[in-house]
Amino acid sequence: MRLRLIAVGSRMPKWVEEGWHEYAKRLPSELAMELVEIPLNTRGKNADVARFIRQEGEAMLAKVGQNERIVTLEVHGKPWSTEQLAVELDRWRLDSRTVNFMVGGPEGLAPEVCARADQRWSLSPLTLPHPLVRILIGEQLYRAWTVLSGHPYHK
């Protein structure tokens, strides 16, 4: 099974890349975690934001295979505790499909991406900076794996 974070935005600060890679390398090879960056369209004051969101959404969906699972990160998604995420991770492993976690740009996800979601996940009711979300997803997936494997990290 593969875990893939598909996120709008590239050229993240070094601390974001290091944080993401730290958790990705901690996971076992049978639970490989990959990052796919979708370039953020430059927003000017007269930008057609709706068109940019649609283009970013199309680019995100183009990275997803036909039978792969999509989990969107949305403020109105379902909040999961660590234990609930571990249960979901275990279900996903049994399903053995690639799981794609979709993180939109500053204005959020395209409606087309949300419509394709198998699940909607909310990390918090707070608005979080997108670079930090990458690290949080990586850490939470690693933490969920440690719960399933009895590793002491979660204690």
From Swiss-Prot:
Where in or outside the cell is it found?
Cytoplasm
What sort of enzyme, by top EC class, is this?
A: transferase
The answer, when asked if Translocase is one of the entry's keywords, is no
Q: Which domain of life is it from?
A: Bacteria
Gene Ontology molecular function: rRNA (pseudouridine-N3-)-methyltransferase activity
Methyltransferase as UniProt keyword: yes
Sorted alphabetically, the keyword list is:
Cytoplasm, Methyltransferase, rRNA processing, S-adenosyl-L-methionine, Transferase
Where, by residue number, does S-adenosyl-L-methionine bind? 73, 104, 123-128
- Enzyme Commission numbers on file: 2.1.1.177
Catalytic activity, reaction form: pseudouridine(1915) in 23S rRNA + S-adenosyl-L-methionine = N(3)-methylpseudouridine(1915) in 23S rRNA + S-adenosyl-L-homocysteine + H(+)
| CDD domains named among the record's database cross-references | RlmH-like
Pfam families registered for this protein in UniProt: SPOUT_MTase
Q: Which GO terms describe its cellular component?
A: cytoplasm
The UniProt entry's sequence similarity note says: Belongs to the RNA methyltransferase RlmH family.
Its quaternary organisation is:
Homodimer.
Please name the PANTHER family in this protein's record.
Answer: METHYLTRANSFERASE (PTHR33603), RIBOSOMAL RNA LARGE SUBUNIT METHYLTRANSFERASE H (PTHR33603:SF1)
Q: What does this protein do?
A: Specifically methylates the pseudouridine at position 1915 (m3Psi1915) in 23S rRNA.
What protein am I looking at? Ribosomal RNA large subunit methyltransferase H
Gene this chain is encoded by: rlmH
